């Protein structure tokens, strides 16, 4: 029920599939990124820019974004509230 979330540079993801949006600086997340690359489950949506967030999906795919985690989370919540508002108006 979150719709599509813009993660930068015209890329969008299905909000319902997102498990976490995290900062990529910790060692465990760097290992997770490396493992996803080996398994063919890494999606790089940075367009060559610095990775500022890692998005983890329910299918164990790892998506790299050049947008800050806070910004993506804000877009996530804006989409949620917009969909909620639309659903409430439709019930009236």
From Swiss-Prot:
It comes from the Bacteria. Pfam families: RemA-like (PF04025). Belongs to the RemA family. NCBIfam families: PRK04323.1 (NF003315). This is Putative regulatory protein CTN_0877.
